[in-house]
Amino acid sequence: MTIHAGIRYHDGDVSIGAPPPDTEAHLPLGANEWLRAAPSRADMYSFVVYDDERPVGYILLHDIDQQTGESLIGYALAAPSDRGRGLGTKALGLLQLFVRDTTRLTKLIIITSRDNEASQRIAAKCGFLHTGPSREDPLNGMVFEWVVRR
């Protein structure tokens, strides 16, 4: 996995960028599992999400397929108090800018569960279209796609 080391992308007080030096102390539960997988995953690219200067979560591209130009997206905010404030929507919008401006990817995909309405709202606000059920879980999984326009 590549951990972003370049400039931060900003939208007001929200930004995505490189992790702080003591990364593991700031990431939400489960994120450390992604980091431990880093050496064996060349198909991942991750950012830390910041609210002002405070790390609040992560957002990443994973299962990046350079041949098809597609990538899945994962994201999480650590504290419940950080949810419902638009941070996830802004972080996803910033990731879309990064992808459009610096990669050759042509499609981003979010797979979420039917009961994760917050993730569905984030996807819709950022222009992702619901394209149907997921192959892995057709009863509960929902697929949202965004075509990169340059």
Describe each PLM feature range.
Residues 1-29, 43-150:
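Acyl-donor (CoA/ACP) binding surface of acyl/acetyltransferases
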Residues 37-43:
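Short loop/turn motifs at secondary-structure junctions and domain boundaries
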